[in-house]
Amino acid sequence: MSLDLTRQRLESAKERINRYIDQNLLLWATEEILLPGQTDIAGSISQRASEALSLEKSGFMKVDLKWDFRSEEGAPIHFFLEYGTRPHRIEAKGREHGGADALHWTGPSGESRFAKVVQHPGTEGKNVIATIKEERTPALRERIIKETQNHMEVDSI
């Protein structure tokens, strides 16, 4: 067998493996990254926040983890939770603007608190997406290796 023919066969096998990975990557990433990530978010934030986590096919053999968790008014809560917020002032909208005349929240000891204006101290970012990717990507790599090896064994029979 000539060297050129051997190279062609190896290239063909490599292309088939890459195509196999690309065709199955979204399923594997869903099982290894998305579902466990949603469970983590549901436990640490809320079920509604976990439902806003998704995977998107972003190219050949590529997927991106997306989180688009928004308030009823459309505010990007996912961004505030992921990266944190600076200290900021919060004012009641007032009834004439479709809101309430006072802000309401539950204090640390469970009592109801009210104010027209508060100076919020800001929040530290939780790095939810970064943490999920860091913790779950090794499992996806292992899954790709295992599935590819199984596919190659079946394909060679």
List PLM regions with ranges.
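Extended Gly/Ser/Thr-rich low-complexity repeat segments
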Residues: 74-93
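Short, Lys/Arg-rich flexible segments
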Residues: 1-74, 97, 101-157
